[in-house]
Curated annotation (Swiss-Prot):
It is found in: Nucleus. This is Decapping nuclease RAI1. Its cofactor is a divalent metal cation. Keywords: Hydrolase, Metal-binding, mRNA processing, Nuclease, Nucleotide-binding, Nucleus, RNA-binding. Its main location: nucleus. It comes from the Eukaryota. The keyword Transport does not apply. Interacts with RAT1; the interaction is direct, stabilizes RAT1 protein structure and stimulates its exoribonuclease activity. The interaction also stimulates RAI1 pyrophosphohydrolase activity, probably by recruiting it to mRNA substrates. Its EC number is 3.6.1.-. One of its GO terms (biological process) is NAD-cap decapping. It comes from Yarrowia lipolytica (strain CLIB 122 / E 150) (Yeast). One of its GO terms (cellular component) is cytosol. The keyword Nucleus applies. A divalent metal cation binds at residues 157, 207, 222-223.
Length: 349
């Protein structure tokens, strides 16, 4: 077993994320289109006119069952993209945006959220997934209050988004969304980015188009919910949430973050709009987190990761140990977690 310290930093030059392609997931099926792309439309007068109940429809909602999906839809879409272009993607590391977000924010995680990752090398790339079994350990079924918190986040997306730009939407489409029950369909953007010397391909769910006039990932928006801020504790909770929101938006190149604030009984009280690049300023005075420090930590961690042997189908596990400020690396026995369709495609190239 080897390890490296989480106190290590490596100054990083950055390249702007560039969208390579996108895809939709509908009822679990991947299609190389924008059928699940949504558009933001929630005028202030709509919020002021009458309280929007973010628990409406919860009695008819079934929380999506989590299961171990590895990198399956990302690799399925990548194999489709490469078949169309006839060339292999230029990247050293391939993973989900959410995984890099967890690594990036680890130095400032006050909750000591466990991070256990599996890594394999194949055909010129390191692939990173979160270990499913480790992620499930200690998880408890949400109580009624937590279920309302979870649902209100999904519901905010339903009431704030349209299937088409507002000027193409009918009055019925605009008004009926308040009765919609959220489902698990997704729109995913796949971008190529570079942090330091690390060339990365990441996929991440995108909530909506916020600025239709912008191009690429600059047009996208990320929707978040949080309780109203009434005291210092509420403010600190929001600052920490903003850290995660900033990191995940920064990695994908999303320029806009929209916060919906809920009351104690889960009514939508107000909406705030932020530019992703401005969020680190909100942590400046209290020093709850530093965007620059997180980028440098991510760069150091990914650079260490690339020291692993470039031998096809070998498996390793990375365990982030907050208490001892280190990351342990062990070699694993077992089969690759890569999608067979993708592996077969690469072998046929």
């Amino acid at each position: 077993m080897s390890s490296f310290s989480t106190t290590e930093r490596l100054a990083a030059k950055l390249k702007k994320p560039k969208e390579v392609y996108s895809y939709s997931i509908t009822d679990g099926k991947v299609t190389m289109d924008q059928s699940q792309l949504k558009y933001y439309y929630l005028p202030e007068e709509t919020i002021l006119k009458a309280p929007i109940d973010l628990t409406k429809g919860i009695e008819n909602w079934t929380q999506p069952n989590e299961h171990d999906t590895h990198l399956d839809t990302l690799l399925e879409s990548l194999s489709k993209y490469e078949r169309e272009t006839g060339s292999k993607i230029d990247a050293e590391i391939i993973t989900w945006r959410g995984i890099l977000t967890k690594i990036m924010t680890h130095p400032y995680d006050q909750y000591n959220e466990p991070i256990v990752l599996n890594i394999t090398y194949f055909d010129g790339h390191y692939f990173i997934e979160e270990d499913w079994q480790s992620k499930q350990q200690g998880k408890k079924a949400p109580d009624e209050q937590m279920k309302k918190h979870i649902y209100s986040g999904y519901k905010f997306e339903s009431v704030a988004l349209l299937n088409e730009p507002w000027f193409k939407s009918s009055r019925e489409d605009i008004e009926s969304r308040f009765d919609d029950i959220p489902n698990g369909d997704q729109f995913v953007s796949v971008v190529r980015t570079q942090i330091g010397d690390n060339k990365i391909l990441i996929g991440g769910e995108v909530d909506c188009v916020f600025d239709p006039c912008a191009k690429g990932t600059s047009r996208y928006g990320e929707l978040k919910t949080s309780r109203e801020v009434h005291n210092a504790k509420d403010g600190e909770i929001l600052e920490r949430k903003m850290n995660r929101a900033w990191a995940q938006s920064f990695l994908l190149g999303v320029k806009h973050i929209i916060y919906g604030y809920r009351t104690g009984d889960h009514k939508l009280a107000a909406v705030d709009y932020f530019k992703t690049e401005d969020l680190p300023m909100y942590a400046g005075a209290s020093s709850t987190w530093s965007g620059t420090d997180e980028i440098n930590f991510l760069n150091a961690a990914l650079t260490k990761l690339k020291d692993l042997p470039k031998e096809d189908n070998k498996l390793w596990r990375l365990v982030f140990d907050s208490a001892n400020k280190k990351v342990d690396i062990t070699e694993l026995d077992g089969e690759s977690f890569l999608l067979k369709e993708f592996v077969d495609w690469r072998k046929s190239m």
